[in-house]
Amino acid sequence: MKDIGEQLYTTQVNGGPSSLTMSPKQPNRATRTERQEAQTLLYQGSEAEAATMTIATCVQCKSVHKIPTQDLRKGPGQSQDTYVCFKCSLRAVPTQLHFVNNNAGAAHVRNETETISSPVNKFKVRNFKPGKYYCDKCRFSTKDPLQYRKHTLQHEEIRFICSHCSYISYTKGEFQRHLVKHTGIFPYRCEYCDYGAIRNDYIVKHRRRVHERAGAKRPFKTVAKLEPKRTSIPKQSMELSKGPSPRAAFQNKLSDQLSRFSLHANKDKTHNLMLLPELKKYQKDVVCIPNKVTLSEPREVSLLGNKNVEVEVLSPSKEPVHPGMPLTVMAPSELVVPTNCLAQLMDVKVVNGAQQLVLKLFPLEENARLETSRGDGGTSECLSTEKGSGGQKKMLSPEASRSLAVEGNAGDFVGLDRLHSLVQKQLKNVKWVKSCNFFMPNSGVHSQQESFLGSDTIKELQKSHSLCPPRALPSAAIKSHSPASVQNSVPYGPGATVSHFLSKAAVAFADDRRGARSNSQQLLPLASLPSKVPFSGEKGLLPIGESDLEARNRISRPETLVSSDRKLEDKQMESKAVGNTGQVSSVQNKEYLHINITGEDKPRSQQPGDQPGQPKTSETAGATFEGPIISSVFSLSSGSENVPEAIKWNSSTTKIKSIELLRRKIAQLIESCGKPSSLSANSAQRRSIGQAPKLTSKATPKAIQEMSVSLTGPGPTPGPSVGPLQKPPNEDSITGSRQLVPQQVCPQFISANDGKMENRVTRKTPVATPVLIPKGAVLRVLNSSEDAHIIEATCDTPVSIPCSEAQLAGTLPFCPMKQTGSGSQPLTCRSGPADMSPGLETSLRPKSRKEDTICSATAKKMVPVYSTAPGSSDSIRQGRPVSRNLTVSKNKTKQVNSTKKKNKMQANPGRYFKDPPSFFQVARQLRLIAAKPDQLIKCPRRNQPVIVLNHPDVDSPEVTNVMKVINKYKGNVLKVVLSERTRCQLGVRRYHMRLTYQNVAETNHMKRQMMLKMKLKKVHKNNYQVVGSMPDDPAQCVFKCWFCGRLYEDQEEWMSHGQRHLIEATRDWDVLSSKGK
């Protein structure tokens, strides 16, 4: 009956004026059906009806039917194979029967007059092969006619008809793609940005391409979920960025914002334009289309780089904004979409009848680094003072996120990432909100780098600040690339003296290298700074004069929080500080985590604004605040020319369960020994410091260069030379709001001349300053318990090498910054390259004894002594702060280097401890390899560099780490002493040797050799079991190391120990052989 109906209506419908026109695909149909018919004839033998039946596609609905060939006969006005299915010919069948889409949103009603715009053959065959069948509705192709038939019949059953325009699609993907044109909603969305797609695999590819550089993802949306309550803030801040919006609105919004954060006041200050990640919340389902796509430089990304900037839409004023629409928007003049950002539609708002698109600017790449802010272009608006506004304009443009961290807190640096911690801190410190924070967003992007900070401008800034009460002060972000933004803390009361913070911290970031590059020169010239204002910027210069010392002490007061991101800037600052020494140039390009300290000047009278009773010393200050939080560790960038290649330590240090316990014991020992107060304080700090050893290790190499500069000028050289030393490794970069960076300044390198330094050392807890480790310097290798990989000179414990020769490394100033608070990241202070302590002492031996008494309890660490040409070591030594007023004698310093090789483990063990000598005589030899062909190995000369291939004294993480360190300084290791602390850590104590036996002499050599053979017991027809031999007689189960003679009870340990020897011994054979060739 169906067939008859189809035949009856075919001619009628096709001849009539029906709106259902023939498909444009029709021309392809002729060839296709001929091919199909030809193929079906081939299969006549297998199918009885193949000769009479064929497959035809309805020209109206594109459904495929199996029909007799005679049905395709030509009707009036028809081409031969034109076929209209029964349903289409009847035209009475409601569209619901065709409509298979489950989308509830799609309506099932359509105008009969509308034509069904069948898909034009979208799936044209690109690589046509004669033997294949190709589906014209999708990408399906097959050589099997049966499969093809099944497939085409499926298309008849499954169809999607658009409720908006009656478009018919045969695949879900195509239907969804079509629906997006009407609804603007993509079925799949990127969780990190507003990218939408019709297939999930597109989202996956997008995420890998855009958000997962180097495995770092940006959890913007998830973060947003964490702080639902603050959703209004970003909008307000966005409005701030909007050029047209009236100023009054800003201020109201600002006050709301501030009250929300319970900031103490400062309504006139620029609010935090830190747009929170929650920005995501506002985004509606409007399709987010990148309006501007530009590739980003990887360095410019900031975690919160996705800021919202509001712009007013001019062109489609009435119609809804659709994905493909060109938009004309009015943006603030300052708004510049940085080259590395995508602008995406976040939201569409209607304000006063005008549509406002909320565009989100986000960097294409996210380096896991938390750059606190890079202002949302345009967001920063100065609410007061022309000067401030001018300064800010410069900053405004470039970064995608512009957070003016205007918390009001002088010290408070608002890390975008740490907003809520910031809030807490602000609550705490509401009282010292007074000082005006100059926060410089990293505006390094533009060439707008006019160095805003010229010395003149600094003075002006200071002047302006002193004039206006802090409230009036806009936070003028200083725009030079050089991230040095000036922080002037303005005394709250007009009468109070103004303490200017020249603080690099304020600058929160010049993370991008670019900024560093161009602005390195723009850093404040140290000379220009008023003497009162110690430039605490990068390394704050060490004040050398007495007054400076006082200032220094005051500096300890932690005023500004630094965002950890500012690594680069400080570097730049510092480089400037260095006095434009040539070295600086290299520094600038390096990324560097940096702690900025705000140096305060002496006149800082405690003002009501300041925290009442805030202690001057950094230690007490620490009590008040939670410790700095290090948001991340940045890897060193490659090109440091001045750093010896060996110095790049990897920060992964093996952790041992006993580390914490050991740290406590050590601290107690140090304190109990009655060391100078500063030392004890440092040791206490060290405790906390040990916890984050990793952070510093990476930062150091960069800083290192600076140090060398200062050393060269031994005298009370002008600040610049000293300044570089001060480069804090910033382990601390305190990202969140929180931290004082107690003083960064490390008294360390004050030339020996200044005896005064001494005071400073005792009084202040200096911040560790990573410095160039001169090859001749004595460095401490910390045990793994405290970061074995990191070489630090520490002032905690004067290093006395326990040799009869009483060589002492001298106290190396290890100026750790006091880590305050649990959060504080351990600053592993990398202390300045310790100059050789020897220089400090007039008479080496007496001093060593004294030190020994002080430190004997304190464990001694392994100290590799590095020597280069003697001259270099000497020069290096000079910069040392003298912890005790000792005159420097270069000759003595040489003596230290000249310690005899015998002291390397060959020294009589009795000298180290009173254990039975037999064990040590067996196991105490170091195998040396000459660095140069003419060097002596058996009896190395005093200053001859030697490469230690194996250190068989002990097999442990401590010694392994020491060996790694030694290996890195291959040509420069003069002496290796295993300290008492290390030995204690190893458990090698009197009469108790780990894994070894004291009665070595009694062990029978033959029996030991026999033990190398395994004894097997046959436990089954095909099974043997290893039988432990003579378990009752442990003395017979001892294995002697073939390399060093060490004895092991466990055969497995003995084997692994031997393998390590082999690895060490053959490590550089390929290099040596290649050199020989």
Curated annotation (Swiss-Prot):
Entry's localization field: Nucleus
SUPFAM superfamilies in alphabetical order: beta-beta-alpha zinc fingers
Gene Ontology molecular function: DNA binding; zinc ion binding
Keyword Membrane: no
Record Gene3D superfamilies: Classic Zinc Finger
Region described as Disordered: 9-35, 372-397, 561-585, 599-622, 675-739, 825-852, 895-914
GO cellular component, as recorded: nucleus
Feature: compositional bias, Polar residues: 9-30, 605-621, 675-688
Disulfide bonds: none
UniProt feature, compositional bias: Basic and acidic residues: 564-574
ZnF start-end (C2H2-type): 160-182, 188-211, 1039-1061
GO process terms (BP): chromatin organization
Record's keyword annotation contains Transcription regulation: yes
Keywords in alphabetical order: Chromatin regulator, DNA-binding, Isopeptide bond, Metal-binding, Nucleus, Repeat, Transcription, Transcription regulation, Ubl conjugation, Zinc, Zinc-finger
Alphabetized InterPro entries for the sequence: Znf_C2H2_sf, Znf_C2H2_type
Glycyl lysine isopeptide (Lys-Gly) (interchain with G-Cter in SUMO2) cross-link site: K479, K847, K861
Assigned protein family: Belongs to the krueppel C2H2-type zinc-finger protein family.
Function (record text): Through its association with the EHMT1-EHMT2/G9A and PRC2/EED-EZH2 histone methyltransferase complexes may function in gene silencing, regulating repressive post-translational methylation of histone tails at promoters of target genes.
Protein name: Zinc finger protein 518B
